Each structure stands twice: as C-alpha cells, then as structure tokens.
Design a protein with these regions (language model features):
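Extracytoplasmic catalytic/substrate-binding loops of multi-pass membrane glycan-assembly enzymes
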Residues: 26-38, 48-59
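Membrane-water interface at transmembrane helix exits
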Residues: 26, 60, 64, 92-100, ...
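Alpha-helical transmembrane segments of integral membrane proteins
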Residues: 6-17, 75-80, 115-123
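Membrane-interfacial, low-structure loops and terminal tails that flank and connect transmembrane helices
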Residues: 1-4, 96-118
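Aromatic- and kink-enriched transmembrane "portal" helix at the membrane-lumen/periplasm boundary
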Residues: 69-77, 105-116, 123-143
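Short aromatic-rich membrane-water interface segments that cap or initiate transmembrane helices
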Residues: 41-50, 67-70
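Transmembrane signal-anchor helices characteristic of membrane glycosylation enzymes that use polyprenol
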Residues: 4-32, 127-129
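Transmembrane-helix motifs of polytopic, lipid-linked glycan transferases
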Residues: 12, 78-108
Length: 143
C-alpha cells in the first residue's frame, strides 16, 4: 500500500503548526544584538559585518518592500519565520527517510506508516519548539 498522501498531509501539518506558532511569536520590531544591524543592512543593501550574508540581505531587501506589518524590523523578521518553518518541514522529511532506511523498507501497512510519520513529526516539532531554535526563528539573525 502507498502512503505518500498521508506523508504529505502530515508534512503540511508539521509545516503549518511550526509556521503559525512562529508567526504568532515573531518579534514585532528590532530585537537585541545584531538584529538591528541586519535590518538596516537589508534595507540599504550594505554589508553588516564580514562575511556579510548576502542572500539574507537580498531577501531582507525584498521583504522590507512588502506591505506587511508596521515596521521594517517585523518585515525582515518574517524571513526567519518562513525559513524556520521550511527547515522544520525538511527535518520531518529527512526523519521519515532515516526511519525508512533504518527499517529497510517503506511502510507497507497502516501501523508502520503511522509509527514512522508520527515519530518523525514529534521529532521535528520537538526541535521546532526547542529554546534555541525558537529564539532564533523569530528574529532577524543569521547562523
């Protein structure tokens, strides 16, 4: 039996849960440390400090022009929210592949499919709500 649709549905749910929680807790403005520097450098397309993080700055410049939020800090912070939610989605998909490789086969019955997909979802969401990931997923910071 093929459980690809179930895998895709659970992957979408994992993405939505992490995105919604990060979106609801995103910094409304510039936060501490380098965030203000990254926001200012994104708006003006300048190098914040070497090596410069050019891709983040280009995305920050694009997001700073979007008509969302009240200020530039919020707009640039949304890059971290979106990229963090995508990271959790990819972590879920990688965990599914690792579990399937460990077992030596894809799920062939409903119990194996649910065990594989739910355990990968729990692992991905546990990482999503860990302190360090969550803290850096809601502010304009590059690591």
């Amino acid at each position: 039996m093929n459980f690809n649709l179930l895998n895709k549905v659970i992957a979408g749910i994992v993405f939505l849960i992490s995105f919604i929680v990060l979106f609801m807790t995103v910094q409304p403005s510039v936060s501490f440390w380098d965030c203000g520097e990254f926001v200012a450098a994104s708006v003006s397309l300048q190098v914040p400090h070497p090596p410069g993080t050019p891709f983040f700055l280009l995305l920050g410049n694009i997001f700073s022009k979007l008509p969302i939020g009240e200020n530039l800090g919020y707009r640039v912070n949304m890059i971290s929210v979106i990229s963090s939610a995508i990271s959790i989605l990819l972590l879920y998909l990688i965990a599914v592949k690792l579990i399937e490789n460990y077992k030596g086969k894809k799920a062939d019955n409903m119990f194996d499919a649910i065990a594989t997909y739910v355990s990968a979802a729990i692992g991905a969401l546990a990482f999503s709500f860990s302190d360090t990931f969550w803290f850096n997923g809601v502010e304009a910071e590059v690591y």
